[in-house]
Amino acid sequence: MNYSIIIYILGWIMNVEAVCMLVPGITALIYREKSGIAFLITILACLAIGVPLVSRKPSKKAFYSREGLVTTALSWIVLIIVGAVPFVLSGAIPNPIDAFFEIVSGFTTTGSSILSDPSQMPYSINIWRCFSHWIGGMGVLVFILTLLPLAGGYHMNLMKAESPGPSVGKLLPKVQSTAKVLYKIYIALTIALIIFLLLGGMPLYDSLCAAFGTAGTGGFGIKSDSMGSYSLYIQIVITIFMILFGVNFNVYFLLLTRKFSQALKSEEVRCYFFVIIASALMITFNVRHLFDNVWEALQQAFFQVGSIITTTGYATTDFNQWPAVSRTILVLLTFCGACAGSTGGGIKISRLLLLAKSVRKELHLYLHPNAVKKIKMDGKAVSHEVMRATNIYMIVYLMIVAASIFIISFDEFDLVTNFTAVVTTLNNVGPGLSLIGPTGNFGIFSPLSKLVLSFDMLAGRLELFPILILFLRETWKKF
């Protein structure tokens, strides 16, 4: 294990987080909040540790898959621990476990909260909650890749470990250039969203918080009713951009480079939009009687479908009160998730497509035992390694779901609450059903359950394996 390069990157993480904390720090100055002192202390502590770590160049620059996985997991753990400090120091969330849960939910873009009324929080605390979504949405290490002077193609090992989806492709020959392109698209879409929200009359502060949450597909609200009190225009804009941020960013690159046929050939994106439209239409007909007219039902259905499938987690209405059919569709969308290579969470459309194709292949082989049939995606054969990783992912995923439900069941809540709490955190969605619906919160759980759900959020965001590999003894052996 090359510890020197890992420590070096962790130093970069602390320095970058210190810079990011200037956003809530400046907000505290503008609104004259005492919480600014908590951010100042945290920033100085980060720099005091981070600067010496990056000033000492690593003796070895060899950086392989093992280092990539370990660095990714440790980077997120450091990011989370440091990010929770201002919550505790400011007294906004004095309980360390609650603060830990809240910031894990922020950085992993989950949006599950222990707060019953976010509007009672200081402005600086709320913008840090929302900004953590934006930081975690594209991935902090993807941003670090644009800065790190690593050579020898080692960047790819970091990108593979953090990027969502069954496989990672390079848009450009250099991984560092790919990371820069992804962030440029991310920033451009975020700015566009802020402009549209401002044009709708949303205050600047609200626009920033909403844009950070939407871009990162996080869903932290600054009001107790999430997006329910905003105008129809704002809700439509949020709906559109939630769906856009759930699209594989590679598609945007192809569109920008005028490779339209290649972009339109994406099976995952076509399936993604089909699922959204089909789900929204089914829910519309199912909840029509709850609204004044069919258009309102359609708008509410599209908002909630877009929010859940992209794992954003915003709400405009209490869908906990919707008929069983609609609630079932939303739970299924929780598992589904957005596209690979997007800021969305969940299992991912691409994995589900691969699993469906795998089942179809096996059924075909039952009928034609001697046939040779390859699984293809977008016209290209899928490698055995990708299929093996997809199958193992699903097995581990189900094991974590089962274990987590068992542990939190000791809190003696109903099965719907326990089940949806686990799947909504593991898939980085946010709200669940029953006691943790849009009008509820996760403050009801015991400290142990909050830690279990925090683990689920982090494991889900990192695609399970980087966090699990920390528990293997051979991970920590030297070369």
Give the residues covered by each predicted segment:
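Membrane-proximal intracellular helices of multi-pass ion channels
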Residues: 1-479
